[in-house]
Amino acid sequence: MSAPLSLFVTGTDTEIGKTFVSTALLHGFARAGLRAAAMKPIAAGAYQRDGVWRNEDADQLDAAANVALPATIRTPFLLKAAAAPHIAAAREGVALDIDTIVGAHRRACERADVVVVEGVGGFRVPLAGTRDTADLAVALGLPVVLVVGVRLGCISHALLTADAIAARGLAIAGWVANRVDAAMRFADDNVDTLRAWLEREHGAPLLGDIAHMSPPSPEAASRSLDVNRLLGALRETAPR
């Protein structure tokens, strides 16, 4: 039996479509015949339904996955305040422990063929003490998919984020252009520039260019993603 596959989804910023792309990937993996699960290890911003605290991003991941994970595995740390996680955690007296997340990820991988782990905010978001989400990605040891919100300033944001990922010794399995600004001028030129620079500097291929969608459709977006190429990259780096 082959080892389960997993990847870490990060982005150039918050609100650039990490959850949207993660759910699109889940649809693509399911269409490829894989048992696909998702984790949102740290979620900040919760609402209550039927006496249970929930998170909108986690709900979307659950809806797209074809393997359901217990909430304690899918989201070990659910914070009520919609704020930076270290701020929300401090206000709630919660210690954001990376080892707890690593253990939850191990259990998730026992239940699925592929596990999508969605980060929180950008690549470097403080968690506790001197540790941040980059440390979480390193502890998980997963290849990274970078989501680039295609809007003004995205070239610098993407290149800086890619450099930060590489500086931590992590492989960039690829990147996704998510066109969040329908009115952006020269969007194609920005994507072409990033395609050349990220391939040349980090060997990171463009896995998909997702058009602006209103309303967004993860299932439709999944058809813009080269899931087979991503799976090939994940299999190359998976433990033997």
UniProtKB/Swiss-Prot annotation:
GO molecular function: ATP binding; dethiobiotin synthase activity; magnesium ion binding
UniProt-listed InterPro entries: DTB_synth_BioD, P-loop_NTPase
Record's keyword terms, sorted: ATP-binding, Biotin biosynthesis, Cytoplasm, Ligase, Magnesium, Metal-binding, Nucleotide-binding
Catalysed reactions, as listed in the record: (7R,8S)-7,8-diammoniononanoate + CO2 + ATP = (4R,5S)-dethiobiotin + ADP + phosphate + 3 H(+)
Pfam families from the UniProt entry: AAA_26
Top class in the EC scheme: ligase
E.C. code: 6.3.3.3
Biological processes, Gene Ontology terms: biotin biosynthetic process
Chain residues that bind ATP: 15-20, 57, 118-121, 178-179
Top-level taxonomic group: Bacteria
Cofactor(s) needed for function: Mg(2+)
Primary location class: cytoplasm
UniProt keyword Cell membrane present: no
Keyword Transmembrane: no
Pathway: Cofactor biosynthesis; biotin biosynthesis; biotin from 7,8-diaminononanoate: step 1/2
Binding-site residues for Mg(2+), renumbered to this chain: 19, 57, 118
Residues of the active site: 40
One GO term describing the cellular component: cytosol
Function of the protein: Catalyzes a mechanistically unusual reaction, the ATP-dependent insertion of CO2 between the N7 and N8 nitrogen atoms of 7,8-diaminopelargonic acid (DAPA, also called 7,8-diammoniononanoate) to form a ureido ring.
NCBIfam families with a match to the protein in the record: bioD
Family label: Belongs to the dethiobiotin synthetase family.
Subunit structure, as described in the record: Homodimer.
Full protein name: ATP-dependent dethiobiotin synthetase BioD
Protein's gene: bioD
